[in-house]
């Protein structure tokens, strides 16, 4: 009987895996933004007033379930569950459901960051969650679910990251490790995810996926309901799954164990793009970007310049604090035809534990904007930088076209076309790029969407005239505000 059940699980996993790679975007939209720690009401408004009109495809939201309350309210308290009640500092279940509906109505899908690996870590006394639920993490007692000690793996510490048992059955940074092979645990996780599906979400980012056995996740994913047709999804549509698997290429638990279950976060993309645009690797080598660099196949890779974790670490990863290089890297990310793209929207931080912007009562505050639409009160909002949202529009305009006419100067100046719909040039040298280059575009004058916008037929920034052969004179000065230029057919003057 066990062999039959296992075979059935594997069969279901195989038949559903391709469906779980589909993010269910509207039209030609194809970029996700992570609105890290935003409130549900603010996300709903952002969908209606900015993300929808600018062509964003979806939002990754912070964990929605009740979490532990930690002193100072660090961002990581959201990653320490107390129960699966939908009450956090971002809002309650009613506000969450309202956000999902309003975002779906304007073509912006919602993907929830979900915690299936663990509950909260030890607490000195009885812990209280954001919905008022009490728990005793040290005893592995979580009445709000309920979970008891029998629902967890035995307590042990990860000391050897090359030991599969430790990685998948011991406690990640002291967080109480759930036993996903347990029928009861599986039922509660499936119930939680199905509730979110009923509310209209399009899928899930699965936190700490490498710390769970892939066969257990296959069972859980395969047991989920189809997406809710009342929110515009077709019949039999499966939730989009993207899984956090940190794999630097030498891990005992490999990304390849998860890639057929759904997309996988391609951390090597983030690391290598940071090295390149920091000047530690010549941009000319990016011509073979993607699988040529040993990355996952394009439909299985969730790609990003930085995320909420690695932007807080030392190393090559670029973040908002290096804006010129960050914008160049993001432009390349969104222009090059590889991966399922996600852009980051951060809040300012000075140390690893900095909480999101909050008031004196420790309530998350709403972002405020200046006359140009940029955030001003502790929220960084990279997605509102013109150079980034303009590239979201570029990516929409060139969707389903191939890369062609790669050019480089043998160093850190590059350009390429996307079919006959788009052209990108980057200068990361300390001298000017001044060159007649093939843009592949039809003859005409085009607005550079990096330096300006096309408004009422006029360009507020640079413009490039393309001749009948598709060539245009491209100039990016070494001291220009931005080291990138982007043209596309929807920005023709």
From Swiss-Prot:
Active-site residues from the entry: 207 (nucleophile), 244 (proton donor)
Any one GO molecular function term: metal ion binding
Binding site for Ca(2+): 117, 168, 177, 211
Compartments where found: Secreted
Reaction equation(s) it catalyzes: Endohydrolysis of (1->4)-alpha-D-glucosidic linkages in polysaccharides containing three or more (1->4)-alpha-linked D-glucose units
Gene3D superfamilies associated with the record: Glycosidases (3.20.20.80), Golgi alpha-mannosidase II (2.60.40.1180)
Binding site for chloride: 205, 307, 342
Residues at the site labelled Transition state stabilizer: 309
Family annotation (InterPro entries): A-amylase/branching_C, A-amylase_C, Alpha_amylase, Glyco_hydro_13_cat_dom, Glyco_hydro_b, Glycoside_hydrolase_SF
Required co-factors: Ca(2+); chloride
Cysteines joined through disulfide linkages: 47-103, 156-170, 375-381, 417-440, 447-459
Signal sequence residues: 1-19
Keyword Secreted (UniProt): yes
One cellular component term from this protein's GO annotations in UniProt: extracellular region
Family annotation (SUPFAM superfamilies): (Trans)glycosidases (SSF51445), Glycosyl hydrolase domain (SSF51011)
Modified residues (Pyrrolidone carboxylic acid): 20
Keywords, ordered alphabetically: Calcium, Carbohydrate metabolism, Chloride, Disulfide bond, Glycosidase, Hydrolase, Metal-binding, Pyrrolidone carboxylic acid, Secreted, Signal
Main localisation: secreted
Known EC number: 3.2.1.1
Assembly behavior: Monomer.
Similarity comment: family membership: Belongs to the glycosyl hydrolase 13 family.
Protein name in UniProt: Alpha-amylase-related protein
Species name: Drosophila takahashii
């Amino acid at each position: 009987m066990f062999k039959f059940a296992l075979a059935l699980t594997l069969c279901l996993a195989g038949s559903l895996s391709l469906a779980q790679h589909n993010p269910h975007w509207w039209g030609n939209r194809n970029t996700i933004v992570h609105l890290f720690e935003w409130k549900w009401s603010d996300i709903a408004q952002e969908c209606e007033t900015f993300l929808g009109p600018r062509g964003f495809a979806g939002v990754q939201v912070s964990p929605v379930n009740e979490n532990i309350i930690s002193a100072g309210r660090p961002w990581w308290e959201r990653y320490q569950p107390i129960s699966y009640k939908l009450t956090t500092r971002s809002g309650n279940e009613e506000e969450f459901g309202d956000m999902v509906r309003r975002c779906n109505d304007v073509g912006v899908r919602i993907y929830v960051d979900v915690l299936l690996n663990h509950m909260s870590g030890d607490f000195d006394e009885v812990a209280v969650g954001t919905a008022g639920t009490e728990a005793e993490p040290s005893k592995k007692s979580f009445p709000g679910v309920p979970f008891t000690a029998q629902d967890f793996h035995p307590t042990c510490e990860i000391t050897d990251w090359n030991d599969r048992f430790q990685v998948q059955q011991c406690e990640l940074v002291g967080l109480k490790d759930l036993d996903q092979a347990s029928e009861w645990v599986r039922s509660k996780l499936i119930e939680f995810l199905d509730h979110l599906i009923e509310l209209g979400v399009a899928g899930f980012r699965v936190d700490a996926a490498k710390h769970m056995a892939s066969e257990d996740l296959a069972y859980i994913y395969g047991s989920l309901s189809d997406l809710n047709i009342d929110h515009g999804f077709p019949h039999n549509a499966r939730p989009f799954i993207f899984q956090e698997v940190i794999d630097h290429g030498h891990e005992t638990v490999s990304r390849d164990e998860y890639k057929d279950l759904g997309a996988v976060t391609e951390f090597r993309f983030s690391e290598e793009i940071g090295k390149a645009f920091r000047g530690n690797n010549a941009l000319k080598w990016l011509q073979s970007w993607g699988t040529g660099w040993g990355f996952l196949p394009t439909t299985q890779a969730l790609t990003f310049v930085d995320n909420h974790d690695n932007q807080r670490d030392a190393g090559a990863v670029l973040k908002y604090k290096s804006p010129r290089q960050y914008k160049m890297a993001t432009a390349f990310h969104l222009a090059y035809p590889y991966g399922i793209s996600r852009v980051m929207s951060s809040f300012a931080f000075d140390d690893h534990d900095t909480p999101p912007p909050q008031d004196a009562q420790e309530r998350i505050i709403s972002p405020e904007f200046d006359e140009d639409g940029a955030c001003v009160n502790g929220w960084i909002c990279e997605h509102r930088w013109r150079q980034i949202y303009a590239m979201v529009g570029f990516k929409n305009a060139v969707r389903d076209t191939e890369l062609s006419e790669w050019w480089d100067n043998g160093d850190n100046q590059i350009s390429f076309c996307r079919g006959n719909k788009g052209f990108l040039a980057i200068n990361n040298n300390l001298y000017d790029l001044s060159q007649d280059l093939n843009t592949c575009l039809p003859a005409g004058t085009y607005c550079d969407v990096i330096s300006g916008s096309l408004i009422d037929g006029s360009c507020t920034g640079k413009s490039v005239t393309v001749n009948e052969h598709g060539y245009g004179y491209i100039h990016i000065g070494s001291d220009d505000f931005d080291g990138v230029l982007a043209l596309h057919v929807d920005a023709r003057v």
